[in-house]
Amino acid sequence: MNVLIIGSGGREHALAWKVAQDPRVQKVFVAPGNAGTAIEAKCENVAIDVLALEQLADFAENNVSLTIVGPEVPLVAGVVDLFRSRGLDCFGPTAGAAQLEGSKAFTKDFLARHKIPTADYQNFTEIEPALAYLREKGAPIVIKADGLAAGKGVIVAMTLTEAEDAVQDMLAGNAFGEAGSRVVIEEFLDGEEASFIVMVDGKNVLPMATSQDHKRVGDGDSGPNTGGMGAYSPAPVVTADVHQRVMDLVIWPTVRGMADEGNVYTGFLYAGLMIDKAGNPKVIEFNCRFGDPETQPVMLRLQSSLVLLIEAALAQALDKVEAQWDPRPSLGIVLAAGGYPGDYAKGAIIEGLDAAALLEGKIFHAGTTLQDDRVVTSGGRVLCATALGDSVGSAQKNAYALAAKVDWQGCFYRTDIGYRAIARERGEDQE
């Protein structure tokens, strides 16, 4: 069989790499893909944009029996609806169900309706009421652009001035365009974050391995938010007890609530959670797809066939399958272009990929492209160096050894990915 994967990031390279390992799969097409998917065994790039929905459907109709959607933008635009209307198998939520990521206001209202734990909040489209609410609540407080903003439309304001500036920027200054014409202001939550990703077939749920992302650009979680600078799996904060609570309090009510409201959910569902000291989860956000960079360490640990699991999901038979995981932790470090998440240069030649390929682990490509057979940078997050280890500490050591082999002008990465889990392993107190 042939499979199409829509997207061009590190997540899509990891999905393509995993799908290609299934002996039944002859060819994995990636649209539009990157340099990594261009050179990956059994993989081939197709020059179709993620929003060229009709072209994607035409290609799928003629070439593949299954399509997997990586990024959120085509999901919110209705790629799954189009594929279904043409009788094509496509794994992901419909546009209606993808509102869980496409609109933060929709999500907060949905959570409130179904009594799913989340931060207290209000939605605003006008500046004055928003500022009045800020002054009433005080800082720290969180301001979110309502629509899709590539993971960057969230400001955690530690002072009232910072909060007021963020609201002004979004509602008046048009900082995030259409995405920021409505804002959600919510209480600041204390605790530890975890990424809880499951597969959903409309009624059954299959949890994936847990993970923890590192959103801030700098060491010690400093600097602005990014799409994610690294991740590891599993997340020790999600104990067996917390796992059960998340399923009972968050995942099941979400899947049933969406179905009750006429938006039956099929696809990957990613709950971004804050876990407090007592182990109580609250929903920070939903994503209607696998996380990036979480996909990379999670796929490294998945031993089952991803294709088999997705086929089960499309047949509403997720209750009949189990996912097998490598018991060892994995960790991925994002190598980014200097200046990210702000402006950055493109077109730098990446050195050392062949040397890195000789080490244990895997380098997944994100913002890369091929130019005259050389791999060059083409995005802010460029590569993700990912490795397994007997502990998070050893996975970290292996991943950094991999990252150290690679370089280009302006390359940078955080040096502390996994620090919370490693402190836990050493028995140090978590602050």
From Swiss-Prot:
Keywords: ATP-binding, Ligase, Magnesium, Manganese, Metal-binding, Nucleotide-binding, Purine biosynthesis. Residues 108-315 form the ATP-grasp domain. ATP binds at residues 134-195. Its cofactor is Mg(2+); Mn(2+). Its EC number is 6.3.4.13. Disulfide bonds: none annotated. It catalyses: 5-phospho-beta-D-ribosylamine + glycine + ATP = N(1)-(5-phospho-beta-D-ribosyl)glycinamide + ADP + phosphate + H(+). It is an enzyme of class 6 (ligase). Binds 1 Mg(2+) or Mn(2+) ion per subunit. It comes from the Bacteria. This is Phosphoribosylamine--glycine ligase. It comes from Pseudomonas syringae pv. tomato (strain ATCC BAA-871 / DC3000). The gene is purD.
